[in-house]
Amino acid sequence: MCDVLTIRDLSKSFARNRVLNGVNFRMGKGAVVGLMGENGAGKSTLMKCLFGMYAKDTGQILVDGSPVDFQSPKEALENGVAMVHQELNQCLDRTVMDNLFLGRYPARFGIVDEKRMFDDSLTLFASLKMDVNPRAVMRSMSVSQRQMVEIAKAMSYNAKIIVLDEPTSSLTEREIVRLFAIIRDLSKKGVAFIYISHKMDEIFQICSEVIVLRDGVLTLSQSIGEVEMSDLITAMVGRTLDKRFPDADNTVGDDYLEIRGLSTRYAPQLRDISLSVKRGEIFGLYGLVGAGRSELLEAIFGLRTIADGEISLAGKKIRLKSSRDAMKLNFAFVPEERKLNGMFAKGSIEYNTTIANLPAYKRYGLLSKKKLQEAAEREIKAMRVKCVSPSELISALSGGNQQKVIIGKWLERDPDVLLLDEPTRGIDVGAKYEIYQLIIRMAREGKTIIVVSSEMPEILGITNRIAVMSNYRLAGIVDTKSTDQEALLRLSARYL
């Protein structure tokens, strides 16, 4: 039996930058192959070459033993190769069935046959054991449900190969279990998956094989039963990381940021939140998706209207009616949705690095190009951003490097309070370690840091204390050294 996918000596360059260099691998029917690598390693480029979004420079791609050279994603889909992107690209104001059959609506007498479309959708969902209403509007659905629709859409093309790019980045634990069940079920039917993820625990749970890219070169290709986590880390970063998390040796001082009885005005409403965070402390916020963690950070940064309660800084009551007020008090905020709220996608690295601190780069009342460039170069060096130059568009960078630029933007202001919402989501293990080191270094300098994370090992690995949110209320605050994952889960379900 021939392999469902074979890639031979595939190379791809952009200008003088070689992104893929002679990549070789193959996968059989029903295989679930994990694809790992640091941000910028070439994972996305490889998949875009497979999916017809990029033209390869050299090499060969074979599907079911036959050479293919897809010129577009449409052609790839029609030949059984589908891709579910991390950033779901859907028409949110249209129905599920509209999205399923977009561009290929069944017609009768020149008119869209909605009954057939509805019936075909029901049949498709039933075959995948999915309980989805074809007439539901996409906007009304959760991220996990929308993701299931994308997988169903792939199967409506009789997909042989489905690429999943960071599929669990916005899912709850229960939704991840459901996704894995669907992957296993389709795998038994012969559908092959390429599973792109930075979460090693998931790779070991769901994948039968794993491949690793580093700087465009394949550095590891093995059965999942033959590798250890340390092997994957070494293959990805080119060196051994003795520990998953750096030692948090920051010294915690007195209370600095205090919140008393805080409730917000508009839905979703926070209710009666009280906590205090100390100078030099790394304070974690944990909870299930939709528990109110992001909303609390937004309220602290002046992005949500406070109905009751108060916030104090160094013992003095403060008023936060806008993000401008928060910035004047030397607060910094890195949002969860970096592409939507954290950066200007059409701006350069220099623009995104300096935009939050423009008055500091003036000379004689005018912006100094020299100072702007020096600031960008300073943060590129400090944050180890992989880029061509400060003038490069931030959208051209990998997710991890984009996040480094966003954090660097705030470091230019030397903040006293740093609010980080999922700072390592979608970032490779090497970049994660660097961000952990940065967080600990800032805590050592006496900064007050609040970190939201959905990854329990991460929040237990880098924080001093953890507040657990449940249904927009504070369920409890625990000392990190004296708690565990089970205790965090119990607290997160307290008000459900």
From Swiss-Prot:
It is a peripheral membrane protein. Keywords: ATP-binding, Cell inner membrane, Cell membrane, Membrane, Nucleotide-binding, Repeat, Sugar transport, Translocase, Transport. It is found in: Cell inner membrane. Residues 5-240, 243-496 form the ABC transporter domain. ATP binds at residues 37-44. The gene is mglA. SUPFAM superfamilies: P-loop containing nucleoside triphosphate hydrolases. One of its GO terms (molecular function) is ATP binding. The complex is composed of one ATP-binding protein (MglA), two transmembrane proteins (MglC) and a solute-binding protein (MglB). Part of the ABC transporter complex MglABC involved in galactose/methyl galactoside import. Responsible for energy coupling to the transport system. This is Galactose/methyl galactoside import ATP-binding protein MglA. It catalyses: D-galactose(out) + ATP + H2O = D-galactose(in) + ADP + phosphate + H(+); methyl beta-D-galactoside(out) + ATP + H2O = methyl beta-D-galactoside(in) + ADP + phosphate + H(+). It comes from the Bacteria.
